């Protein structure tokens, strides 16, 4: 069974959009996929239904999305829209790294189908004084789906994220480009450039919500 960590080349790139699309695609084919969003900054309880975790809950078929429901997949929620280590400190709290990893592992072990763990921000965002999202991924030992944008600068940002992940021996299952307006070049050109620069054995690079991406998801669900 395949489980994936959803991270990105930066913040506000579309991790939740891509993760929710993966969940909806699998569930439409009767694959019992689930997702976690364990850490969130910029979270407002009154807007729980439109939060990242709320969007994932709706993709999983939840009819009632409120703060209590969000807490089941997002235990560490902070109001300030800043780096999670800073958001936690500003709230007088911290993100206990071992507890974070244990929470995810318990959910993965109990999963009946594919489990997605959506990170926070980009791959190198700090979680506390010593840990980043990359450390979180490495501790879980699951493959990454790296979300990239179509904006100016995305090629450099994506290649840097790939290098950072590879430096820790983290397997990248796929790179998914989430087309973001305005697009400085056609998204297919971005895909071609990434493939040229990702090394001799590059991970597959897809454009979100395309037949090729959906076919890859179908194959991943059968592993």
UniProtKB/Swiss-Prot annotation:
UniProt: ATP binding residues: 12-17, 52, 118-121
Pathways per UniProt: Cofactor biosynthesis; biotin biosynthesis; biotin from 7,8-diaminononanoate: step 1/2
Subunit-level organization: Homodimer.
Protein residues bound to substrate: 41
EC identifiers of the protein: 6.3.3.3
Residues that coordinate or bind Mg(2+): 16, 52, 118
Gene behind this protein: bioD
Organism, as annotated: Acidiphilium cryptum (strain JF-5)
Stored NCBIfam families: bioD
Name of the protein in its database record: ATP-dependent dethiobiotin synthetase BioD
Keyword line: ATP-binding, Biotin biosynthesis, Cytoplasm, Ligase, Magnesium, Metal-binding, Nucleotide-binding
């Amino acid at each position: 069974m395949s489980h994936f960590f959803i991270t990105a080349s930066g913040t506000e790139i579309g991790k939740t959009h891509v993760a929710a699309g993966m969940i909806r695609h699998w569930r439409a084919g009767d694959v019992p996929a689930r997702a976690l969003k364990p850490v969130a900054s910029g979270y407002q309880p009154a807007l729980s239904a439109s939060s990242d975790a709320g969007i994932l809950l709706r993709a999983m078929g939840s009819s009632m999305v409120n703060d209590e429901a969000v807490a089941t997949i997002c235990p560490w929620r902070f109001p300030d829209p800043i780096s999670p280590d800073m958001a936690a400190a500003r709230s007088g709290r911290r993100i206990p790294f071992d507890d974070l990893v244990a929470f995810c592992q318990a959910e993965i072990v109990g999963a009946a189908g594919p489990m997605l763990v959506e990170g926070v921000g980009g791959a190198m965002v700090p979680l506390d004084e010593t840990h980043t999202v990359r450390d979180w991924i490495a501790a879980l030992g699951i493959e990454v789906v790296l979300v990239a944008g179509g904006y100016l600068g995305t090629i450099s940002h994506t290649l840097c994220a790939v290098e950072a992940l590879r430096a820790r021996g983290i397997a990248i299952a796929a790179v998914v480009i989430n087309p973001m307006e305005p697009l400085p070049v056609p998204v297919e050109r971005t895909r071609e450039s990434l493939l040229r620069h990702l090394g001799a054995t590059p991970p597959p690079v897809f454009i979100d919500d395309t037949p090729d991406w959906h076919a890859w998801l179908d194959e991943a669900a059968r592993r």
